[in-house]
Amino acid sequence: MNLNTLSPDPGSRPSRRRVGRGIGSGLGKTCGKGHKGQKSRAGGYHKINFEGGQMPIQRRLPKMGFKSREGRTIDEVSLGELAKLNDEVIDLVALRKAGLINNSIKDVKVILSGELTAAIKLKGLRVTKGARSAIESLGGSIEE
């Protein structure tokens, strides 16, 4: 069974009533739209956010903030993820090769999360205070 082969049981989904096919059909002439008015016309209904002519809420409220480009180039890596690597020196190149960060990342910060069992050597990465103490307590080193 695949998602693209699923279909409802025969007869469980009645077909849509066709409109404008004579008085006897129950939906002839005005096709269920009543007489005159904007909603009876072709293409005739207001936009999704139209509020009857008053100033819409998305224009009444001020614009706020922006998305920092800086945030898109920095990433966090946990000690638990670094423990799985078996490289001698862990730097940006090693993290890219391991698939922990993508090519757009220019800077990485190591955070204290997960379990570290062996000493590791970091090069050119930012490190939090907690992660620094955990690495140094196991005999690891950090080069700036």
Curated annotation (Swiss-Prot):
GO terms for cellular component: cytosolic large ribosomal subunit. PROSITE patterns: RIBOSOMAL_L15 (PS00475). Residues 1-45 are annotated as: Disordered. Keywords: Ribonucleoprotein, Ribosomal protein, RNA-binding, rRNA-binding. It comes from the Bacteria. It holds the Pfam family Ribosomal_L27A. The keyword rRNA-binding applies. Residues 21-31 have a biased composition (Gly residues). HAMAP family: Ribosomal_uL15. Binds to the 23S rRNA. Belongs to the universal ribosomal protein uL15 family. Part of the 50S ribosomal subunit. NCBIfam families: rplO_bact (TIGR01071). This is Large ribosomal subunit protein uL15. It comes from Legionella pneumophila (strain Corby). The gene is rplO.
